[in-house]
Amino acid sequence: MTTSGVRVRIAPSPTGEPHVGTAYIALFNYLFAKKHGGEFILRIEDTDATRSTLEYEQKVLEALRWTGLTWSEGPDVGGPYGPYRQSERKPMYWPYAEELLEKGHAFRCFCTPERLEQMREAQRAAGKPPKYDGLCLHLKAEEVTTRVAAGEANVVRMKIPTEGSCDFHDGVYGDVSIPWDSVDMQVLIKADGMPTYHMANVIDDHLMKITHVARGEEWLASVPKHILLYRYFGWDQPTFMHLSLMRNADKSKLSKRKNPTSISYYSALGYLPEALMNFLGLFFIQIAEGEELLTMEELAAKFDPEALSKAGAIFDIQKLDWLNGRWLREKLTPEDFIARTLEWAMENSRLTEGLKLAQSRISKLGELPNLAGFLVSSDVGLTPASFAGLKSKPEEIHEILTTVAADLEKMPDWNVEAIEAELRDIAERTGKKLRVVTPPLFVAVSGSSRSLPLFDSMALLGRSVVRQRLKVAIAVVATMVGSGS
């Protein structure tokens, strides 16, 4: 690279709830920078205009700040290589696309989405992996000029060698060889003028003088495209390190369908950020049994990027619980414990707003734990008996809960008004009265049929906690359906 000193980055996309996988990759980069006396940079990759939102960007920033990580450059703190949002860098990318077109390293593609889908279907039917077939690769310059001038929609694709392989060294996987004929002619500039991840990623890493790219192993297959772009532009490429994905205990990819994956979920349930980062940091170091309790400074001191394994990092919630318990007992003084508990209870106004809702529903303060305790509880203790008092049969309860769980995932906003509107829409679509839809949800989110107002409660708990409680409720009710309860 053309810079002295190590520079690494974390580049999340603000398209959903901040994932623990983001914290995992961010921590590796942070520790790598600490180890080498380098710089840790935050960049927001919001080229997906249809899914990226400022609300999710704010959630990403809040979640990463909560973990205790700090960055020297980013959209919130600025820096010499900004802007640090890709959407604000859009004018920078087109000149590079023009350079690739002029040098013959890229071409314009006029294929419609319908034509591309037909192509993919035919390839799948033939048992071939879907990739662009090169229809527009050899269009004459005059035809391209005419169609562009006429305003015909097009994208810019990169050219790929047809023979040989891309050979490179990865900091985790060692020497890797990927045949060029397996690499797609990647879209670099979309029809709306925005760059794809691959184009923006390479250009931004170069302009921001990133020396080491550490990211998830799912990007390993994309390295040939990135290396090719570095070659086309005549730039030195960074060192690549592809980290093993975090996995469930059954070795499946960590996903919200099996385990809570949102950083906000762990914050809401009262996990200490130090404990979560301690837990994630153990994937990057080698220690003896009994030495697991480590601060960020101790993790940095023991961090050894040369000792990384290709084996999947198992996200064991039981181990996280054990580690968090040790932090609470061994790392906090009684005064710290009280202060952190109060800080957690007041987080996002969950407790204060909950108390306001409870005020008109109690006759004495001693009723508060039963009425509002679910707002600060990690588990509401659902059993088949929890749903036994409802008028709906288990089959209908199961249908309601699964429908609500699926629809809530699609909601762009999470607030009282949006939740109420969504549940009313579900009731209308399913032909049910709202008073039939809401009782199972009362039980699912609070553990009781008598609780605080449902829409307010769901808003206060947050999407990630509601998601997990619905998942547990669906599993409980499924046993009732199977047993004929």
UniProtKB/Swiss-Prot annotation:
GO terms for molecular function: ATP binding; glutamate-tRNA ligase activity; tRNA binding; zinc ion binding. The keyword Ligase applies. Its cofactor is Zn(2+). Binds 1 zinc ion per subunit. Its main location: cytoplasm. Keywords: Aminoacyl-tRNA synthetase, ATP-binding, Cytoplasm, Ligase, Metal-binding, Nucleotide-binding, Protein biosynthesis, Zinc. It catalyses: tRNA(Glu) + L-glutamate + ATP = L-glutamyl-tRNA(Glu) + AMP + diphosphate. One of its GO terms (cellular component) is cytosol. ATP binds at K256. A motif ('KMSKS' region) lies at residues 253-257. The keyword Aminoacyl-tRNA synthetase applies. It is found in: Cytoplasm. InterPro entries: aa-tRNA-synth_I_cd-bd (IPR045462), aa-tRNA-synth_I_codon-bd_sub2 (IPR020751), aa-tRNA-synth_I_CS (IPR001412), aa_tRNA-synth_I_cd-bd_sf (IPR008925), Glu-tRNA-ligase_bac/mito (IPR004527), Glu/Gln-tRNA-synth (IPR000924), Glu/Gln-tRNA-synth_Ib_cat-dom (IPR020058), GluQ/Sye (IPR049940). A motif ('HIGH' region) lies at residues 12-22. One of its GO terms (biological process) is glutamyl-tRNA aminoacylation. Its EC number is 6.1.1.17. It is an enzyme of class 6 (ligase). Catalyzes the attachment of glutamate to tRNA(Glu) in a two-step reaction: glutamate is first activated by ATP to form Glu-AMP and then transferred to the acceptor end of tRNA(Glu). Belongs to the class-I aminoacyl-tRNA synthetase family. Glutamate--tRNA ligase type 1 subfamily. Monomer. This is Glutamate--tRNA ligase. It comes from Agrobacterium fabrum (strain C58 / ATCC 33970). The lineage of its organism: Bacteria, Pseudomonadati, Pseudomonadota, Alphaproteobacteria, Hyphomicrobiales.
